[in-house]
């Protein structure tokens, strides 16, 4: 099966025309567009192929979690778009596991400091609300969602499958962090150290976004791929508009 892989298209800043390839499935690994825009874009440019869609953090900007989950999941019903949040999709002999993931805020081994830093510098915790009370979305909320997603992923990966692709928005390893940000104190809000987790379960491919620089490397037998377009000022970052990977 051939996968056409994208993340961080950010169509709220600049439109993206989907190129035709020989892919069997399109993967959108988060931050396609804020609110409902990413889903609406995916419907408008559909190339007759099934699309797998997960939320990033930006989908929730000026929206509420989990209300937007319910809204966008409903928008995908009856379309070629499969919305995943702690959900599994089987296509042929390939099992696809998808979730936003968020992070464990433990990349540097100091969760309280990471919570404080993320709360101060990340727009996630300024622009996202929680429904139904519409209180502020906090780093501890993201951490709780992460723990639930990891628990679900682990239970899913324990079940054998011919081929497995994991899709998350947040990065599963510090190896995905661009060199210029290697020591940034906000990194715990971008990546978790799931290297041992990946080594234990060895899915075939782990696709992520959130970083606005491409990544393509292996952890054991698992290929880690990030193909982000990023913001307009980042165009030229190495993004491949027609990236197709076979699993």
Where are these regions (language model features)?
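Active-site neighborhood of phospho(di)ester-bond hydrolases with catalytic His/Asp-centered motifs
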Residues: 5-7, 26-31, 52-57, 82-86, ...
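Beta-strand-turn-beta hairpins that frame and shape the catalytic cleft
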Residues: 1-4, 88-98, 218-223
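Binuclear metal-dependent phosphoesterase catalytic core
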Residues: 79, 178, 184-204, 211-247
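Active-site environment of divalent metal-dependent phosphoester hydrolases
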Residues: 10-16, 33-37, 58-68, 88-91, ...
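A basic- and aromatic-enriched beta-loop-alpha substructure that forms the phosphate/nucleotide-
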Residues: 53-59, 64-125
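N-terminal active-site segment of His-dependent metallophosphoesterases
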Residues: 1-54, 59-68, 130-133, 139
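Active-site-proximal loop/helix segment associated with metal-binding centers of metalloenzymes
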Residues: 97-165, 171-181
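Glycine-rich phosphate-binding loop signature in dinucleotide/nucleotide-binding domains
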Residues: 20-21, 91, 158-162, 202
